[in-house]
A protein has these predicted regions:
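Intrinsically disordered, low-complexity regions of eukaryotic proteins
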Residues: 10, 14-18, 22-23, 317, ...
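Aromatic-residue-lined binding/catalytic grooves and analogous aromatic/hydrophobic interfacial grooves
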Residues: 372, 378, 434-435, 447
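A penicillin-recognizing enzyme superfamily signal
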Residues: 438
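A subset of solvent-exposed loop/turn segments in beta-rich extracellular surface proteins, enriched
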Residues: 13-41, 93-104
Length: 453
């Protein structure tokens, strides 16, 4: 069968090649016209397309009380996550397709992935609280350690020969392996102080110092101790429960009113593992030889993103606690944004990770809940909420006005004065409901099977 006709000279057509034979007369066919029924029949099996994920989690929380006011606690957890995945595109039902990374057409492919991540966390905390008449004080302090290791192994190969041997081996065309072996850790010291007076005025102050193996050793910000840089993150919150004032007792419809405000500084340490490391990667030369080429140049100045934030809030209960209203507003400014930055062509690389740019966020949310019916055995509540959040890029590195990034075949733009990570698409003008409308617009199909010549 070829070009829509049956020929006697195509006696060697097999299940795996019939689509290639059928499309042999077309120079620009759409390889996405694979047979979905054949893909399900020949591509589904535990040794073909299969995904398995398992997790083991252990946690202990011992606590020792010295007396009624002083205690020492520990939170230790261990998490093991394993992922095993097989991916297979069958020969039968799928025509040859173009693999851009190889610059050539291939019949089918087989892939496998196995990953393992170990995560250990330890949080040791000392707590003290005391009340002096109308004054209540609580102090907490401790240190938190986190250690992670991640191993990833991947394999890929093309042209298995038939769908009965979907196994990956060195005999496959363009067979390749990859993977990573990452280990990182972080350490944080923190203190927190809470104070309230007669349940009316509340104050909270926090301070944390944190360092991570992912940070560079020569960051612009932070305090250097023990040979590494530490980020310092303070915070302060205050609130007033107005309904606990004696002069508010006469307002029967208002059961609870709390006003709060605060400021804090936080950091984002989600740095790529290799951002501060220079490393080599294997490279194939025309399929004839393999070697090592420099794949990344570490940036020892890279650091955490820093966000400074203010917030205000109102909590109220009214009408004998049958109606609750919550309102929160925040505004934040983030600097040292983590992003790709261009490198000199002399380095042999296009980009590397760095800090640059600034971003503003602001928004609010409102929530209302109401008790429609309440009885000792049954309660009915309804609620509604609405929120609005908006961000704007205020600066980019190297004096740039905008930056374009290619992600999964799409272009994402980050531009000063506009929201981060913009992407655009076509707007649909409508759907043709009849063939006459499509013909009037000059649209048609060349062949009955929809193949474009």
């Amino acid at each position: 069968f070829s070009g829509g006709k049956i020929y006697e000279n195509h006696l060697d057509v097999t299940d795996e090649t019939y689509l290639d034979e059928a499309l042999a007369g077309y120079s620009n066919y759409n390889w996405k016209l694979g047979n979905p029924l054949a893909i399900l029949e020949y591509g589904e099996a535990q040794n073909k397309n299969h995904f398995e994920n398992s997790m083991l989690s252990l946690s202990i929380k011992p606590k020792f009380k010295f007396n009624d006011h002083l205690s020492l606690s520990e939170h230790f957890s261990y998490v093991l996550t394993n992922t095993n995945e097989k991916y297979y595109i069958p020969l039968n039902g799928v025509p040859d397709y173009y693999v851009s990374s190889l610059g050539a057409f291939r019949q089918n492919e087989a892939r496998s992935l196995f990953s393992k991540q170990n995560s250990i966390m330890s949080d040791t905390r000392l707590e003290w609280d005391q009340r002096y008449a109308a004054h209540a004080i609580a102090l907490r302090g401790g240190f938190r350690m986190q250690w992670d290791s991640y191993q990833l192994n991947t394999q890929v190969g093309y042209n298995t020969g038939n769908d009965k041997t979907p196994f990956i081996s060195s005999s496959l065309l363009d067979a390749a392996t990859g993977g990573t072996n990452d280990q990182w850790n972080s350490l944080a010291y923190y203190v927190q102080a809470d104070y309230n007076f007669k349940g009316r005025y509340y104050l909270q102050a926090t301070m944390a110092a944190e360092s991570s193996s992912r940070f560079g050793r020569d960051t612009d910000q932070g305090v250097k101790m023990c040979g590494v840089k530490w980020g310092i993150f303070p915070g302060f919150q205050a609130s007033w429960v107005a309904t606990n004032e004696s002069w508010m007792a006469g307002l029967g419809f208002l059961n609870y009113l709390r006003l709060s405000a605060g400021v804090d500084v936080s950091g984002n340490d989600d740095l790529p593992y290799y951002a501060t490391r220079s490393y080599f990667a294997s490279s194939d030369y025309m399929g004839l030889a393999s070697g090592l080429t420099i794949a990344g140049i570490g940036n020892e100045k890279i650091q955490w993103e820093r966000t400074r934030r203010i917030n205000i809030g109102v909590d109220a209960n009214l009408l004998n606690n049958r109606l609750g209203v919550r309102f929160n507003y925040f505004r934040s400014a983030t600097d040292h944004l983590l992003m790709w930055q261009e490198m000199s062509y002399l380095s042999g690389l296009d980009k590397t990770w760095g800090n640059g740019g600034k971003l503003e966020n602001r928004g609010f949310d409102v929530e209302a809940t109401g008790v429609v019916w309440a009885s000792p055995s049954w309660q009915w509540q309804v609620g509604a909420s609405v929120g609005h959040y908006k961000n704007k890029v205020t600066a980019l590195p190297d004096g740039q006005r905008y930056m374009d990034t290619e992600i999964l075949g799409a272009t994402v733009r980050t531009e000063i004065g506009r929201p981060a990570n913009l992407f655009y698409g076509y707007k649909a003008q409508g759907v043709f409901s009849t063939s006459a409308e499509a013909q009037a617009a000059g649209l048609y199909i060349h062949d009955d099977n929809g193949v474009d010549r």
